């Protein structure tokens, strides 16, 4: 029996395994402007936009100091952040460019 998820379904949050928590926070909070909501010891942080409990969880539980995953391995490939206006998107892009962050 097949089932199709309703079109109104939304993803509430995602958790990302990171090698360096501070580096991830520098990117998501420092460059993109997400808010740090809380931390869980030295191994996890929860960030959001607009005061939500967390849109993104960042953790090093099984990935601390790990090398980047090989290009041809399974895993998350792309994430899109929908800014409310083109101006907000332009601000984020300028911050990335000004920080010499690689954009592909």
Task: Give residue ranges: language-model regions.
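Core segments of cupin and vicinal oxygen chelate
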Residues: 16-62
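Conserved donor-binding loop and adjoining core beta-sheet/short helix segment
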Residues: 59-74, 80
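Generic structural signal for well-ordered secondary structure
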Residues: 40, 51, 72-74, 89
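A detector for short, charged/polar N-terminal pre-domain segments
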Residues: 1-6
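Short amphipathic alpha-helical segments
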Residues: 10-14, 75-79
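Vicinal oxygen chelate
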Residues: 8, 18-22, 80-104
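Short acidic, gly/pro-rich beta-turn/loop elements at beta-sheet edges
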Residues: 26, 57, 68, 89-91
